[in-house]
């Protein structure tokens, strides 16, 4: 069925319809054109091998951009990568990009960084686009009104070869967040509260559109944080309709349109809103005024509670599967039911990742750390999401604030978000992290992760236990 027959359409449906090359028939998928393909060193080697074996070129190298992020160290970046597997992946990406004519921002380059930070800051990410990457958190780019999703390695090869992807239409979900956020509550708290409410499978098969006055009041950085973690709710993608905040963020970015092209683009972008009367498959509501700083206690992003709460008791969970999962999580996290979240001591604090490694996040952290010290026995890593973010932070004097406080101010990369580089937890170490996943071993074998906002991360580093800035007064 041709999707263009719909009258009142959601934002996701509009972007989808604009990119259908061939409509699927008899339950076949639609063939969707891809506007931007982001590539990194981990999920691309086999895709390039497939092209090489088939004798195929990259169809649109001009719509493909690569950066090194997952495996790169965040110190001594002028030296060879020590780990042989990481070194091989980075060197392979460099060879593949050179062979196939793909733009690459390597380690040390002024535009190097996490792929989901680099795309937006360069103005490559724009409203109405379809964007893919061999990475779960590609949904970040949906903050601009783009339909952005993570894909597997075989799909990476398909996009490299054809600039298209066969996809079946997704269901749609509206997450309405209305009201005024209380002081000290951020976008990270919104998304953690949502995932706790609907669960890690609540958005399965859906594209989530985040709507409402609280979402509209967020900066682009805040919107990216929320869309970034859509996948942790099981969703295929997350989106926010573009508005003046979006346009101002994009204006004068290196790859943003200019002059008459800007005017034409703006005319299209302004149509990218869900039509009155459009029907979502699912709707969820959150009252922003009732939210507070949020933190996870378990081993998936849905196992979270307000910071002011206590570790939940699995015996009070009715569902057998959820109860068993909670028991297993508490055993791994070495936590007892009833313990106040604010009494949980940490060994490390990590600020960074594609969730919270942007300049706005670093400003929040600096505001908390200024005039204070990281608690004895706590190691704090602050890792900018890109070299451009690092340069801006240095220009604003934030780097000095971090180092004077006793934090480690690093170079750009994925860092301690995942155990694919030297920045890892030791077994049994507990970390408050601004990243997006708290799975067992995510930050290193045996490491224990609590997901938090940048403000909570900074306060936790100072106090030594899970804390909000208000706890420091």
UniProtKB/Swiss-Prot annotation:
Q: What class of enzyme is it?
A: lyase
Q: What keywords is this UniProt entry annotated with?
A: 4Fe-4S, Amino-acid biosynthesis, Branched-chain amino acid biosynthesis, Iron, Iron-sulfur, Leucine biosynthesis, Lyase, Metal-binding
Cofactor(s) required, per the database record: [4Fe-4S] cluster
Q: Which domain of life is it from?
A: Bacteria
Q: Does the keyword Membrane apply?
A: no
Q: Which GO terms describe its molecular function?
A: 3-isopropylmalate dehydratase activity; 4 iron, 4 sulfur cluster binding; metal ion binding
Kindly list the positions annotated as binding [4Fe-4S] cluster: 354, 414, 417
* Cross-referenced SUPFAM superfamilies: Aconitase iron-sulfur domain
- Reactions accelerated catalytically: (2R,3S)-3-isopropylmalate = (2S)-2-isopropylmalate
CDD domains, sorted: IPMI
The note describing how and how many cofactors are bound reads: Binds 1 [4Fe-4S] cluster per subunit.
Q: Which InterPro entries match?
A: 3-IsopropMal_deHydase_lsu, Acnase/IPM_dHydase_lsu_aba_1/3, Acoase/IPM_deHydtase_lsu_aba, Aconitase_4Fe-4S_BS, Aconitase_4Fe-4S_dom, IPM_dehydratase_rel_enz, IPMI_cat
Biological pathway: Amino-acid biosynthesis; L-leucine biosynthesis; L-leucine from 3-methyl-2-oxobutanoate: step 2/4
Q: Which PANTHER family match?
A: 3-ISOPROPYLMALATE DEHYDRATASE, HOMOACONITASE, MITOCHONDRIAL-RELATED
**Quaternary structure and partners:** Heterodimer of LeuC and LeuD.
| HAMAP family xrefs | LeuC_type1 (MF_01026)
- Name of protein: 3-isopropylmalate dehydratase large subunit
Lineage of the source organism?
Bacteria, Bacillati, Actinomycetota, Actinomycetes, Mycobacteriales
């Amino acid at each position: 069925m041709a999707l263009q027959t719909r009258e009142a359409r959601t934002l996701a449906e509009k972007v989808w319809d604009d990119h259908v090359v061939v409509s699927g028939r008899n339950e076949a998928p639609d063939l969707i054109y891809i506007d931007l393909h982001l590539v990194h060193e981990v999920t691309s080697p086999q895709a390039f091998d497939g092209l090489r074996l088939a004798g195929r070129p990259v169809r649109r190298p001009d719509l493909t951009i690569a950066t090194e992020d997952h495996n790169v160290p965040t110190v001594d970046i002028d030296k060879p990568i020590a780990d042989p597997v990481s070194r091989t992946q980075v060197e392979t990406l460099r060879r593949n990009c050179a062979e196939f004519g793909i733009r690459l921002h390597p380690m040390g380059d002024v535009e190097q960084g996490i792929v989901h930070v680099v795309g937006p800051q360069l103005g490559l990410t724009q409203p109405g686009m379809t964007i893919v990457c061999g990475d779960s958190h590609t949904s970040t780019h949906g903050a601009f009104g783009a339909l952005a999703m993570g894909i597997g390695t075989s799909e990476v090869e398909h996009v490299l070869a054809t600039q298209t992807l066969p996809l079946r239409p997704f269901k749609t979900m509206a997450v309405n967040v209305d009201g005024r956020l209380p002081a000290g509550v951020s976008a990270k708290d919104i998304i953690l509260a949502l995932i706790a409410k609907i669960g890690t499978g609540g958005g399965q098969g859906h594209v989530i559109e985040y709507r409402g006055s609280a979402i509209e009041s967020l900066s682009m950085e805040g919107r990216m944080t929320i869309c970034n973690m859509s996948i942790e709710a099981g969703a295929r993608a997350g989106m926010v309709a573009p508005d003046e905040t979006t346009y101002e963020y994009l204006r004068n970015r290196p790859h943003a349109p200019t002059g008459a092209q800007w005017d034409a683009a703006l005319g299209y972008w302004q149509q990218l809103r869900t039509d009155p009367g459009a029907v979502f498959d699912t709707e969820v509501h959150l009252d922003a005024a009732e939210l507070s700083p949020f933190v996870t206690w378990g081993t998936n992003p849905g196992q979270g509670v307000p910071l002011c709460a206590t570790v939940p008791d699995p015996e009070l969970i009715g569902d057998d599967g959820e109860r068993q999962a909670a028991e297993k999580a508490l055993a791994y996290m070495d936590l007892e039911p009833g313990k106040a979240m604010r009494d949980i001591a940490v060994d490390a604090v990590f600020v960074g990742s594609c969730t919270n490694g942007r300049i706005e996040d670093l400003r929040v952290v600096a505001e908390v750390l200024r005039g204070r010290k990281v608690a004895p026995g706590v190691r704090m890593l602050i890792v900018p999401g890109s070299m451009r973010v690092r340069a801006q932070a240095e220009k604003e004097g934030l780097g000095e604030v971090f180092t004077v406080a006793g934090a480690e101010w690093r170079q750009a990369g994925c860092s301690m978000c995942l155990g694919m580089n030297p920045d890892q937890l030791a077994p049994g170490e507990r970390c408050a992290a601004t990243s997006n996943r708290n799975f067992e071993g995510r930050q290193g074998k045996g490491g224990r992760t609590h997901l938090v906002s940048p403000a909570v991360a900074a306060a936790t580093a100072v106090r030594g236990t899970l804390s909000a800035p208000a706890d420091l007064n």
